[in-house]
């Protein structure tokens, strides 16, 4: 199957037809192909402030720089939660790594079957074999749903703060990182208190993990 997404400077189809091409031959599409109220402003990795990367890694995948696509500690905890009836979606942290989240975004597969989860793990491993961590982060931060029709941090920075992503403050970076777990629940406009609570959690985790000081 194919999935439409955003690259560093173009819109692309990422092809998932076969295992050898699992993470994607990229086929350029005409500019403006995405429409219908969807906002996107692709940015390159070099434009992303370190604080933005740190905010997303801190709250979404703290072992991102160490694992190879799957965080087995979180996966094991998720299996225990699932078997005991405590569904992951009700917790502050899911089992999926940033790499796995990117796979979901590119494949369009987001059901919770065991087969789908195993498939996702295999694809995440493929992605890590094909791309650097920086390339994975760039793709991830360009395709994530950040509420209000914004896809990617470039569009969200302009929409919420009226500035390019490179000019975001630490608090603004944390605000965007707070959204992606559940865009409707953490929308800064419609759910400001929820977003603030999770933004503060992101800032606390950034401090705890040594990215910022109090």
For the regions a protein language model found, what residue spans apply to each?
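Juxtamembrane regions of bacterial inner-membrane/periplasmic proteins
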Residues: 1-214
């Amino acid at each position: 199957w194919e999935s439409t997404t955003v690259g560093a400077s173009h819109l692309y189809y990422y092809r998932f037809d076969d295992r050898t091409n699992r993470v994607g031959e990229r086929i350029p599409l005409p500019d403006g192909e995405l429409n219908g109220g969807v906002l996107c402003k692709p940015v390159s990795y070099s434009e992303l402030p370190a604080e933005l990367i740190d905010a997303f890694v801190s709250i979404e995948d703290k072992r991102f720089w160490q694992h190879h696509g799957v965080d087995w500690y979180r996966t094991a905890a998720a299996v225990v939660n699932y078997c005991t009836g405590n569904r992951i979606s009700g917790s502050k942290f899911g089992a999926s790594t940033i790499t796995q989240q990117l796979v979901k975004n590119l494949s369009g597969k987001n059901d919770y079957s065991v087969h789908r989860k195993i498939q996702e793990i295999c694809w995440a491993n493929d992605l890590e074999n094909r791309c650097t961590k920086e390339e994975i982060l760039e793709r991830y931060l360009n395709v994530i749903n950040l509420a209000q029709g914004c896809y990617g941090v470039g569009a969200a920075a302009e929409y919420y703060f009226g500035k390019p992503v490179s000019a975001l403050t630490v608090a603004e970076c944390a605000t965007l990182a707070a959204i992606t777990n559940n865009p409707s629940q953490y929308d800064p406009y419609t759910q400001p208190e929820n977003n603030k609570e999770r933004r503060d959690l992101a800032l606390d985790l950034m401090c705890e993990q040594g990215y910022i000081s109090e």
